[in-house]
Amino acid sequence: MKLSEKIAAIESGEYAVIWTTPAGSIMKAADYGPYYVVYRNGEPLGAIDSPDDLDTFAAANHYTA
């Protein structure tokens, strides 16, 4: 499952997915409406505005479903 699909499927009220990279970084992607905010170890890295770009970011940062 792509990260964008996983976030879209969450029904808990907080639309976020957290995973750990092989290097030990804790990654988080949160859906804030028109964009996603991505974090590494609690620090914001930036905003991503499309599901395709989010999935590219996720693949580059070792996200696995």
Locate predicted features.
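Short amphipathic alpha-helical segments that mediate assembly, nucleic-acid/protein binding
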Residues: 3-6, 54
